[in-house]
Amino acid sequence: KSYKTVRDFQHGFMRDFVENILKKTATDFTYNGLENVTSKCNMFVSNHRDIALDAAILCYVFAINDMECFEVAIGSNLMQGDFVIDIAKINKMFKIARSGSAKDFYRDSILASEYMRHVINEKQQSVWIAQRNGRTKDGDDKTELGVLKMFSLSSDKAFVENFAELNITPIAISYEYEPCDFLKTMELYISSFQKYVKEPGEDLRSIIAGIMQQKGKIKISVTPSITREELEYCD
């Protein structure tokens, strides 16, 4: 079957692909909070448990409800190989730098921040980004300060106005059985006594394992956007 637009591809092939994964690897799937997605574009900030499925499942929820899918920020380490890059592009993914010199990393962070603000305010589309650099491996979901600092790099406005423009909307996803639990445990164990160095192709193996592994019950929640009043309280 051929698809003429990105929307057609996401609402056709990708919708069926994710639905098939859920049927084969999940015993139950529920979601809530779509009423919190208004006509205003959102910066979806999600906890991060699986490399591919966290964003893909939310996009699936949007597709089955005939809602426009969002652009997705992914680590530059995942953009390897022509096939992966092509799939990423057709699913509206863009890369966030994961390595490089301090100068290059800062420059790339500014560009990513400017692009995300452009997508939300000018292109009038939403963005999905993980709350941290890499998946949570110890079960402690916390938004990294570096992610919030990156958001701020694209505006000279004061804190409240800067972040209010992004319409930050937290996303929570949970899996009964942690994706890649064995691989994450091994990484945590090794990291406890030495620097962990990934093997070539390890990210791809984790993507495949996360997709194929049994997940039990899955739930995803879209929470209300952070309000101006809440931002003023934090200022």
Task: Please identify what each model-predicted range represents.
Residues 40-42, 68-71, 125-127, 167-169:
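Generic beta-strand structural signal
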Residues 29, 42, 70, 93-94, ...:
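A broad, low-specificity signal marking well-ordered, structured residues that form hydrophobic/aromatic
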Residues 35, 46-50, 76-78, 97-100, ...:
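Short, flexible loop/turn elements at secondary-structure junctions
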Residues 1-42, 48-59, 63, 85, ...:
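Membrane-anchoring hydrophobic helices of lipid-metabolizing enzymes
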Residues 41-113:
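Long, hydrophobic, well-ordered secondary-structure blocks that form the structural core
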Residues 105-235:
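Non-catalytic C-terminal accessory region of glycerolipid acyltransferases
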Residues 37-40, 89-96, 125-132, 219-221:
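Glycine-rich, often proline-containing surface loops adjacent to acidic residues and nearby aromatics
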